[in-house]
Amino acid sequence: MITVVKRNGRIEPLDITKIQKYTKDATDNLEGVSQSELEVDARLQFRDKITTEEIQQTLIKTAVDKIDIDTPNWSFVASRLFLYDLYHKVSGFTGYRHLKEYFENAEEKGRILKGFKEKFDLEFLNSQIKPERDFQFNYLGIKTLYDRYLLKDANNHPIELPQHMFMSIAMFLAQNEQEPNKIALEFYEVLSKFEAMCATPTLANARTTKHQLSSCYIGSTPDNIEGIFDSYKEMALLSKYGGGIGWDFSLVRSIGSYIDGHKNASAGTIPFLKIANDVAIAVDQLGTRKGAIAVYLEIWHIDVMEFIDLRKNSGDERRRAHDLFPALWVCDLFLKRVLEDAMWTLFDPYECKDLTELYGQDFEKRYLEYEKDPKIIKEYINAKDLWKKILMNYFEAGLPFLAFKDNANRCNPNAHAGIIRSSNLCTEIFQNTAPNHYYMQIEYTDGAIEFFEEKELVTTDSNITKCANKLTSTDILKGKPIYIATKVAKDGQTAVCNLASINLSKINTEEDIKRVVPIMVRLLDNVIDLNFYPNRKVKATNLQNRAIGLGVMGEAQMLAEHQIAWGSKEHLEKIDALMEQISYHAIDTSANLAKEKGVYKDFENSEWSKGIFPIDKANNEALKLTEKGLFNHACDWQGLREKVKSNGMRNGYLMAIAPTSSISILVGTTQTIEPIYKKKWFEENLSGLIPVVVPNLNVETWNFYTSAYDIDAKDLIKAAAVRQKWIDQGQSINVFLRIENASGKTLHDIYTLAWKLGLKSTYYLRSESPSIDEKSVLDRSVECFNCQ
C-alpha cells in the first residue's frame, strides 16, 4: 500500500479519488487529452511516503511531457494543475481570498506600497474579480507569471494570485483618476482578459514599494571628462532599478584628437566604452541579470571601424567590450555613397560636433563643407568597404544594430524641441535627447557665486583675457579673488520608454480597437505620473514630453486564425487597416486626455499642433505597398486634425512596437509582429525544458503558421514599412536568414530596402542552419527583458 505525506506532515493511505478530482477538473472540456492517461502515467512514478507536493509535481510533469504538435492542450492541463497547487500555497484552499485580505497580507510583508488601496471600494472591486480567467494561461504562461511577476515573501513563498495581481496593478495605475473604481475596473478587464498587456517592469513593479515602471532609457554623453563620468553614474542608477539603456557616444572625440591643445592625446571612444561595459557588469539589474546597455555611434566618426569590432573575440582586449550592444547611427548620405561606390569621409567630433545636431539636407550641406575644409582632420574609406564590414559583422554576430538617423528625424513629431540622437536597446524608441550642458561655477572668497559658459571669454583684473574654463584661484575678477572654479552640469534630456502592447489575436476589429486602445493610452499616461524615477533628469524629461509607446503583439496568430499568408497582399492590407485604426484611436485618446488633464509641455509648434500626423510624413515607397489613396482611409483624419489643433495632445510620443517575448508568453500568443520560429520548440526554465506549441494550432491554421526562416526577409521589411506609416516612433524588427541563403548581396538588398522604405532601425539578424533539431531550445539570452 502506498502512503502519502500530507502538507501538515500527517501520513495516510493514498486516496486515488482525491487525485481524480483534480485530474478531472484539469482535463475537462479540453480536446485531445485524457484523464485516465494522465492518472496512469503519473501513478507509474508514485512511491511509498510520497508527499502531496511531489504528487502535484508528478502530475504537472506528466502533462508537460505530453505537450506536442498534435496534442497542444496538455499545456492547459499542466497549467490548471499548477494553478491548483498555487491556490493552496497562497490561500490554503482552491480559490481566492477577499481582495482586502490580499492587500493587508502583502502590506504586512512589505511587498505592496501602502496608501493606495484606501482610495478604492474594495468590496466592489473584489466582486468584479474573475478567477475563471486564470484558466486562459497555458503552462509556460503561468510558469512565467509565477517566476517573474507574482509577489513573494522574504522566503520566496508566493503571496499573490493572478487575478489579484491584475487588479492591484489596475488599482495602482488608476489611483489618481477622478473615478478610480471605474477606471481600475476598465484596466483590470483589459489586462485580465489578455486583450493587452503592460511591459515587464510595469507588471512586475506596479503596486510595489519600488514602482519603477519604465522599460528603458536613452541618453547622450558630452565630450568632457565630467560629462562622461556623470553618464556612467546615470547609467549605473538606471541599471540598478532594472532599466535597459541606449546611449549615444557620438560626441566623444576620436582617437588621435586634441586634448587641451595637444594633438594625438585622445585615446578615442573605445576606452570609455570599456568602462561602460564594466558598469553593465558591476551594476546588475537588482541582482537578477547583468545590465543591458546599447551604445550608439554616428557612422562618420573616426572610431567607427574599431566600434564595429567592439565585441570581437580577437584583438586587443583593452579595446573590446563584450557585454555592450553596439549600434550605428546611419545617415542617408552614407548609404547614397555606398550605392555610388564613392569614398566616405570620417571626422573627429571635437572639430565637427554640429554634425550630431543636424540631419537631412542641413547635415549633408555641412558634411560637404567639412570634407572641403583642409584644416579639418579627416580619414577616408571606400563607403562600400565600410558597408561590407558592417554587414559581415552583422551576419557573424548579429551586431551592430542599424538605426537610420534621417528616417528617424524626418518623422520626429517634436523636431522643434530637439533632435533624436539614438534609439534604445531594442531599437523601437525614437525621442529627443540631449547631453548635459556644462558651465563654469566661479566661487569667490566672499562666498558669492557666478556662472560662465565654458568657452566664454573673461577678462581678469590683470587684464588677461581667457576662456572661463581656464580660470583658477590665482585670478581676480572685478576686485573679487576666486576661491575655486569648478565645472557643473545643467541637466540635458534622458528619454524614457513606457510600454504596453495590444494583443492582435484578440483585438482585431474596429469595434474592439476603439474600446481597448483608449484604455491602454490612459493606462500608459498614468504610468508617467506614478512612476519611480531613478534620477531627476529622467523625470523632468518624461514630464516634458509625456512619451508612451503603445505597440502590438500576436500578429502571426491573428494572421493564421484569419488564414492569411505572411507577406501576401492580404497580409499587408490587413495590418494596414489595423494599424490605421490603432493609430487613429491612440491620437484621438491623447487629444481627449489633453482636454481632460492638460497638454504636454512641448506641444506648441510640434507637428501635432499643426495637424501633421505620422501618416502625413509616411515614406512614399511604403505608401505604394498597399496602394491606398489619400481619400481611401477608413478614419476621419481631417476631423481628428482639427480636434488635435483645438485640444492639443497629452503625449508627445505615442506608438512604438517593442519585442514582447515575456508578455507574449504570458498571454499565450505569438511574439510581437514576428512570424513564428517553429511550430514547436522548447523554452528553458528553472524547471528544465518546457515544450511549447504555437497557439491554436489546428487543421485550419497549420498552413498559415510559416517559420520566419521560410519567409523572404524582404517581406518582413515590407510588412514593417506598412506598419511604420502609422507609427510616430519605431519597431523592433529582427531579420531572419537561413545560413545557406545568406550572401553579401542578400544582406545589402535587405538593409538598403529597409532604409528606402522609411524604416527607422533594424534589431538582430538571426541566422539558422538548415538542419532541424526537434529538441531546439529558443535562445532568449540576447533579448532585452525590459521591453518585453
Model-derived features with residue positions:
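Core nucleic-acid recognition elements
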Residues: R10, V33-M167, K182-Y188
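A glycine-rich phosphate-binding loop feature that marks nucleotide/adenosyl-phosphate handling sites
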Residues: D41-A42, I60-A63, A78-Y84, V190, ...
